[in-house]
Amino acid sequence: MQKNNRVVVGMSGGVDSSVAAYLLKEQGYEVIGVTMQIWQDKDEEAVRVEGGCCSLAAVNDARRVANKIGIKYYVMNFKDVFKEKVIDYFVDEYLRGRTPNPCIACNKYIKFEELLKRAWMIDAYYVATGHYAIKEYDEERGRYLLKKSVDTSKDQTYVLYNLTQTQLEHILFPLGKYKKDKVRELAKNLGLPVASKPDSQEICFVTDNDYGKFIRENAKEEIKPGEFRDTRGRFLGYHKGIIHYTIGQRKGLGISVGKPLYVVDIDAENNVVVLGYGDEVYGDELISYNNNFISIDKLEKEMRVKAKIRYTAKEQDAVIRPLEDGRVFVKFDNPQRAITPGQSVVFYDGDIVVGGGIIERKVR
């Protein structure tokens, strides 16, 4: 495709994507706002009111913003591919005793793959979002880099580590060099109708934040109760189904042995949740798979990095080493709490995203 200044902005009806659309228009881009219709909850009222970027209210907010700033606006249907790539993945991972991050899957398969395809269909060279991240081209490396946002408290590079060089060429992140409070101030000064709208906190398609209920309603198999066992295999009691538990969990176990117990492992094959004491939740080695690298073409030798094992975690010193099958071995300098299969581990070199992958398992 020939390079042009037409950009499709993914508009969720929130303040960030709204300001992103405005900034791009001010920079001279031909901006087309698009809200992705991705999920229809069975509870129509919940979707209308609470459904985050999936709700009918979000569509109305995005349309009002588009009218206010004077850009074209469309709603596009992504329901089928979203169900396949995000919903089914989310449910299947929990059934396997793992804890997925659906936002990472949504970014990988929907926002920066499917939306980009739609953008190209209407001859738009770029796709933009309201993510807090910076894209730069490094002449020396001959690669696009993904770097942390100026607002480190809002940085979203953790959920963007899957981006490819081709995708990065066609992506714009207008908010990367803005602080969140400045974005809100800008929205307020512009009179945008979403200026005071709170940020969404929950997973957009689980409107009541009840993961267990959502998985039961969407699973193709029955959720069966099973056994709690300790790390030596001794029976401790019964659980209500592995979908209700995640590594490091303490609340809601219903088991008392005099000392606090935590979930330290989930054996989906045998429907067993393994409980242990506080020190047994920690580990310093893991293996990741489905790895993607951004600042380098591929990991060919041992490399010292900062790594984080969940969105809210702090970066920790670690060494990463390539394995023969494309997986990566990660060794932390210090033990990490609750290394959780299904979550992602992301590697940093200063403010540059090296890459990342999905945690397969804790080694020790």
UniProtKB/Swiss-Prot annotation:
Residues 154-156, 310-311 are annotated as: Interaction with tRNA. Its EC number is 2.8.1.13. Disulfide bonds join C106-C204. The active site is at C106 (nucleophile), C204 (cysteine persulfide intermediate). Keywords: ATP-binding, Cytoplasm, Disulfide bond, Nucleotide-binding, RNA-binding, Transferase, tRNA processing, tRNA-binding. It is found in: Cytoplasm. The keyword Nucleotide-binding applies. It catalyses: S-sulfanyl-L-cysteinyl-[protein] + uridine(34) in tRNA + AH2 + ATP = 2-thiouridine(34) in tRNA + L-cysteinyl-[protein] + A + AMP + diphosphate + H(+). One of its GO terms (biological process) is tRNA wobble position uridine thiolation. It comes from the Bacteria. It holds the Pfam family tRNA_Me_trans_C. Gene3D superfamilies: Adenine nucleotide alpha hydrolases-like domains, HUPs, Translation factors. CDD domains: MnmA_TRMU-like. ATP binds at G10, M11, S12, G13, G14, V15, D16, S17, M36, G130. Coiled coil: none annotated. GO terms for cellular component: cytoplasm. Its main location: cytoplasm. GO terms for molecular function: ATP binding; tRNA binding; tRNA-uridine 2-sulfurtransferase activity. Catalyzes the 2-thiolation of uridine at the wobble position (U34) of tRNA, leading to the formation of s(2)U34. Belongs to the MnmA/TRMU family. NCBIfam families: PRK00143.1, trmU. This is tRNA-specific 2-thiouridylase MnmA 2. It comes from Caldanaerobacter subterraneus subsp. tengcongensis (strain DSM 15242 / JCM 11007 / NBRC 100824 / MB4) (Thermoanaerobacter tengcongensis).
